[in-house]
Amino acid sequence: MKTYYMFGDSLMRGVMPDEAWNYHSSDAIGFEAMQAQYNMKFLNFAMPTFTSERVKMWLTQVISSHPVPDVAFLECGGNDCDYDWKSICEGKCDYEHRHRVDPQDFKKNYEDMIHLLQEKGAAATSEIATPIAIEMYLSHLLESGISREVMSEYVNSVQQMQDEYAEYGDIMRAVSKENGCEILSLRESFLALDDMKAYYSKDGMHPNEAGYALIRGDFEKYFASAAGII
């Protein structure tokens, strides 16, 4: 029986906001059922709000205190690419350093995590996160109090933000290929949709039940292939 560890952020915890804007974890992806279905052990160490820096620290701690898994999923990038709106609104962040984690630092963190796992004898599977429903996300920011004037100084277009989120995924792909890691991308299932917004919660970042069902399908294909079912 193979053992899988998951390291990531709120996406892998099935997090969704309720009507009062309280965020709750869920088993919307269905990892519990997949353990029995595909005869494997799955431990979820994903933590909401974590950037790659926090994931790396957490992974280091977990790997030093738990049995080494056969495979560890590494899912991050969404929080890294997100703008540091708190610092921006306080005038403490210039345009060049708008991301919570700069691309070059993100790349280094991701390389470090892969190397740590490989040194321990675990295979790393890079998990490319879902895209962001940018227009919904920007509307959410405006409703949360970010001024349109401040936003316009940092966001030139929806396409700009789409390209930046894709860039972090491209970094993961490049690092993964350089280090011989398998890649599981969740992006394509969403990008193929006619109306992607219908699969997201109202913040534009977290999928809704329908969106998490798409993610569940991608994982079912992955585990079925790993188990030799397909």
Which residues does each predicted region cover?
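Serine-esterase "nucleophile elbow" of acetyl-processing enzymes
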Residues: 1-47, 60-68, 72
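Secondary-structure boundary/capping motif
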Residues: 1-3, 31-37, 56, 115, ...
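Residue-level detector of flexible, active-site-proximal loop/helix-junction positions
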Residues: 11, 49-51, 190
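Short, electropositive, low-hydrophobicity segments enriched in small/polar residues
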Residues: 12-14, 18, 53, 81, ...
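A short linear-motif detector with a strong N-terminal bias
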Residues: 22-24, 51-53, 161-163, 185
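Short secondary-structure transition/capping motifs
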Residues: 44-51, 99-102
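Structural motif
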Residues: 49-59
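Alpha-helical cap/lid subdomain in secreted, periplasmic
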Residues: 60-209, 213-230
